[in-house]
Design a protein with these regions (language model features):
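Short alpha-helical donor nucleotide-sugar binding micro-motif in glycosyltransferases
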Residues: 263-268
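Donor nucleotide-sugar binding/catalytic pocket of nucleotide-sugar-dependent glycosyltransferases
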Residues: 37-40, 158-203
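A conserved catalytic-core segment of Leloir-type glycosyltransferases
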Residues: 38-108
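Short N-terminal targeting/anchoring amphipathic segment
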Residues: 101-121, 135, 270
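A short, histidine- and acid-enriched strand-loop-helix "catalytic/donor-clamping" loop
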Residues: 11-13, 131-152, 164-167
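N-terminal subdomain of nucleotide-sugar transferases
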Residues: 1-61, 65-67
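Aromatic "clamp/platform" in nucleotide-sugar-dependent glycosyltransferases that forms part
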Residues: 276
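Conserved donor-binding/catalytic core segment of Leloir-type glycosyltransferases
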Residues: 4, 209-229, 235-242
Length: 284
């Protein structure tokens, strides 16, 4: 099957840790014999603006086209102000780049579109699906519902796109319930919770050190600049452990591939996942 994946997040040549959850999905689909192409719409921005968020690193000077592994990727640019105070600007921009994407695809025609994240990538996916006469599937990882629905500027657009997609995949039971509240029918909802691999189900090893005045290596497996990861709570935890007599060292991970994150989690004495938005074992 020919599948077009549309996503606001995807690994870039200078930021391979970006959008690893989408890259994992693409690899899985390719391993099953499907033919995949990726559209990763990027906001227009200057280099200094990348510092506002780790997922924006590499966006300003990203190439228009590149290959990630064996997958062809196009990165059309859209206009959008921070916080999307005027969604209509972004919508008009998505309408313009729809033609660019179709031109890039040429004679290659997908049979279905899978869209990771709803706003604003879902608007592009919806337009492409309508023009090609094919279904599109939206996937909600958390941000669209947890943050987007609370924003008066984007909530209406997210609700519109949720009801436009043919099927909606949610990665947790909580997000599944929110989708139902938005009017999505049970027949069009797919609940796909992230599985915990067998290696994480091993029993905790017996502690060999002293319970007091011994060094404890704590891993915060995410970029502290991402506010939703709640790095401050991890620091407070370390401070409390020090008050109780431990010698604490906290290590953070910035823009690391998931394989490295997993390896570090396996060797750390303690891994702290303090984010309230995680729906499965780790998006670093």
């Amino acid at each position: 099957m020919r599948i077009l994946v549309v996503s606001l997040l995807f690994p870039l040549p200078t930021n391979v840790a970006r959008g690893t959850f989408v890259s994992d999905n693409v690899k899985l689909l390719e391993s099953m014999g499907h033919e995949i192409k990726v559209v990763n719409p990027l906001p227009r921005m200057l280099k200094y603006q990348e510092s506002s968020r780790s997922t924006l690193t590499g966006v300003a000077r990203a190439p228009k086209q590149f290959t990630h592994g064996d997958t062809e990727v196009i990165t059309p640019r859209f206009w959008g102000l921070p916080g999307h105070p005027y969604p209509s600007i972004t919508i008009r921009s998505m309408k313009r780049i729809t033609k660019k994407v179709q031109s890039w695809l040429g004679e290659w025609r997908p049979e279905i579109i899978i869209c990771h994240t709803i706003w604003p990538a879902g608007d592009l996916a919806s337009r492409l699906a309508k023009q090609m006469g094919i279904p599109w599937v939206g996937i909600v990882h958390g941000h669209d519902f947890d943050v987007g629905l609370k924003d008066k500027n984007t909530s209406g657009q997210i609700i519109r796109l949720v009801n436009q997609c043919d099927h909606l995949v949610t990665v947790s039971s909580r997000l599944h319930s929110i989708a139902k509240e938005l009017g999505k029918t049970a027949s069009s909802l797919i609940s796909c919770h992230t599985a915990v691999e067998d290696e994480w189900l091993t029993k905790p090893k017996k502690w060999q050190g002293r319970w007091r005045k011994s060094k404890l290596d704590i891993l915060f497996p995410a970029d502290p600049r991402r506010r939703e990861k709640n790095h401050f709570l991890a620091l407070q935890t370390g401070e409390e452990l020090e008050n109780r007599g431990w010698i604490v060292g906290i290590t953070t991970l910035r823009q690391q591939p998931r394989t490295i994150v997993w390896d570090r989690m396996l060797v750390a004495d303690l891994t702290l996942i303090t984010s309230k938005r995680e729906s499965g074992p780790l998006v670093a």
